[in-house]
Design a protein with these regions (language model features):
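N-terminal accessory targeting/assembly segments
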Residues: 1-196, 207, 567
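Flexible beta-alpha connector loops of hexameric P-loop NTPases
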Residues: 145, 300, 310-331, 363-378
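Carboxylate/His-rich catalytic cores and anion/metal-binding grooves
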Residues: 193-197, 203, 259, 266-297, ...
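N-terminal pre-Walker A segment at the start of P-loop NTPase domains
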Residues: 208-243, 278, 286-302, 307-318
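Glycine-rich phosphate-binding P-loop
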Residues: 242-274
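Conserved alpha-helical scaffold flanking the Walker A/P-loop in AAA+ ATPase domains
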Residues: 329-341
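Conserved P-loop NTPase nucleotide-binding/switch module
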Residues: 341-385, 389-390, 402-408, 412-429
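Conserved NTP phosphate-binding and transfer environment spanning the P-loop NTPase/kinase superfamily
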Residues: 390-393, 399-567
Length: 567
């Protein structure tokens, strides 16, 4: 390991040389108070910036163990450190001048959700801090600008480290509040099943967002207030007593007029699988962490999924126990999404009528009279929803605005009236008595077969040059094969998409051999991340990308939409 002085001498020596000479800086250097590692050097000032990491010993950083003693507190502290370091980066970004990306200093940008990220890691045993960032090495044209480079690494970064990564220079009260909030959120998440709840929305929560492109809370929004009949009281370790609407396990129907807040409530519930930062308005909107938002997804591929509990006796004689298509219809795609959510061990399904296939959700009486049941291959979701709960323990929350078909089978019916929820279960049930319930399915469905065993694709054998590109939150391209994730609506960050791409790459190289089921493959991926961190997916310290941890359910969703998956 070299010293900081040796690094300065090296950069001074290569000043004004051709840009590739920066490659000589790759390595580890001891700075006062921290270790600097230059992991990857860009080949050109206009290329993706260089990757740099900083390690601070726990004794020097000085963060109290009480701030990271549990997994969720550790993630919250890491998130806070990324935000603090990011603020410092913004202060110095592009202050060092030059061509292309010269002077760029950046770290992962965190949103409203608190996610585990590769950008910051704290060793729970030693308190050591590992920060990963990107730096644009300065150049004049395509020649090295050592003077500006030295400003970044000997002036700007040392100040960022001192201000953001040393506890003595941080706001101790703020960090304690962040830790306490994380502990309260986890306590609330843990207590839901004990109370027979699948979700909780605290009184005073702000559910609407600022705009379609901003996840910040709407300033003029109506604060959430639980109906008296659904209000529950919970005592948290730090916040104390908190009250709000408890959504019980079973079948919950959310109804109301257009623009009254139905979908806004459902959106808050679907993102309640994540913890949110203080001030977001949804800090205490907590949903079963395995909940999955489902919808129709015309055109998606389906790979040997057993959809026979919903679709049978197709006119073309196609086998629906191992259904395969490259262009699914709305109803078929939604049926596959339900079964795949079961495979991913979802405990709650969240469905909005607006984005569902009508013929998958219901069949009204007139249609059943005109088109006999024996002529219809689709068993609608309404005929399986009770079975899903009673046999599989899967609860469902449905938003409906045009059909009252689900009134008969719902356990709880909530009306959104000018953004205020009301429990109208008894009233709606009484009205529903005047409309006889349609007959249910003739027999219970056979439990889907989850024995799919993916194999390694031919293009992966002996090929170390597989290219991958993240396309925002919507898709990822692997070896020119695009995995469309537009309708996996609980992905909140493009870094989660990048992580999903690395999950696929790692699985293709190490796990897919035709002997393991997809469930076993995903379990092994989760185990690796849990034991070795997200960065372990990248397999090389020089190639660690900006990653955010996806849930198990999103890992399944990615494989399910991977057209190149060989089964």
């Amino acid at each position: 390991m070299k010293t900081a002085a040796e690094l300065r001498q090296l950069v001074t020596r290569i000043d004004h040389r051709s840009y590739p000479a920066y490659k000589d800086t790759k390595g580890m250097y001891q700075f006062p108070g921290y270790l600097l590692s230059i992991d990857h050097v860009q080949g050109d000032p206009f290329a993706s910036p260089s990757r740099v990491s900083i390690q601070v010993k726990g004794k020097i950083a000085g963060f109290p163990e009480q701030l990271y003693r549990t997994k969720w507190q550790k993630t919250a502290l890491e998130d806070a450190l990324i935000r603090q370091f990011g603020q410092c980066c913004e202060k110095f970004g592009f202050k060092a001048k030059g061509s292309g990306k010269s002077g760029m200093i950046s770290i992962s940008r965190c949103g409203q959700e608190v996610l585990e990220r590769s950008a910051a890691q704290i060793d729970e045993k030693t308190g050591d801090i590992h920060i990963r960032l990107e730096v644009g090495f300065p150049a004049n044209g395509r020649t090295i600008n050592a003077r500006e480079w030295i400003r970044i690494f000997f002036e700007f970064l040392p100040e960022c480290v001192e201000k953001a990564l040393y506890y003595k220079n941080c706001d101790a009260k703020r960090l304690q509040k962040i830790s306490d909030l994380a502990e309260d959120q986890q306590a609330l998440r843990d207590i839901l099943p004990k109370l027979g709840l699948c979700a909780f929305v605290a009184n005073g929560s702000i559910l609407p967002r600022e705009s379609g492109v901003s996840a910040r809370p709407m300033k003029s929004a109506v604060c959430f207030q639980s109906p008296e009949e659904m209000e529950v009281e919970i005592t948290l370790p730090h916040r104390g007593v908190i009250r709000g609407m408890g959504i019980r396990k079973g079948i919950t129907l959310i109804v109301g007029g257009g623009y009254h807040g139905k979908s806004t409530l459902l959106k808050a519930l679907e993102l309640g699988v994540y913890n949110h930062i203080a001030g977001d308005g949804r800090e205490y909107v907590i949903t079963d962490s395995t909940a999955v938002k489902l919808r129709a997804e015309d055109g998606r591929s389906i790979k040997k999924t057993d959809i026979s509990m919903f679709i049978n006796d197709l006119p073309n004689g196609k086998d629906t126990t191992h259904f395969y298509t490259e262009d699914a219809s709305g109803s078929t795609s939604q049926a596959a999404n339900v079964v795949e959510a079961m495979e991913a061990k979802a405990g709650v399904m969240l469905i909005d009528e607006d984005t569902s296939a009508t013929n998958f959700m219901i069949r009204d009486e007139l249609m059943q009279r005109v088109i006999h049941r024996d002529m219809e291959p689709i068993t609608p979701f309404i005929e399986r929803i009770r079975e899903l709960y009673e046999e599989e323990g899967i609860s469902t929350v449905i938003v409906a605005g045009s059909s009252g078909a689900y009134f008969h089978i719902a356990d709880c019916i909530v009306q959104m009236d000018r953004y205020v929820p009301k429990d109208i279960t008894q009233t709606a049930k009484k009205e529903a008595e005047q409309f006889p319930q349609l007959s249910g399915p003739k027999e219970k469905a056979k439990k889907p077969d989850f024995a799919r065993k993916p194999q390694q694709g031919r293009e992966w054998k002996g090929n170390d040059r597989i290219k991958m590109k993240t396309l925002g939150k919507e898709a990822i391209s692997i070896n020119r094969e695009t995995i469309d994730l537009r309708y996996v609506e609980q992905i909140t960050d493009s870094e989660q998409v990048t992580a999903l791409g690395y999950c696929v790459k790692y699985a293709q190289r190490h796990l897919l051999d035709g002997t393991r089921t997809l469930q076993e493959v995903v379990a092994m991926l989760e185990e690796k991340i849990e034991k070795e961190s997200l960065a372990a997916l990248c397999e090389s310290t020089s190639s660690v990308a900006n990653l955010a941890r996806p849930r198990t359910q999103e890992i399944f969703a990615c494989f399910d939409r991977y057209r190149g998956l060989k089964l």
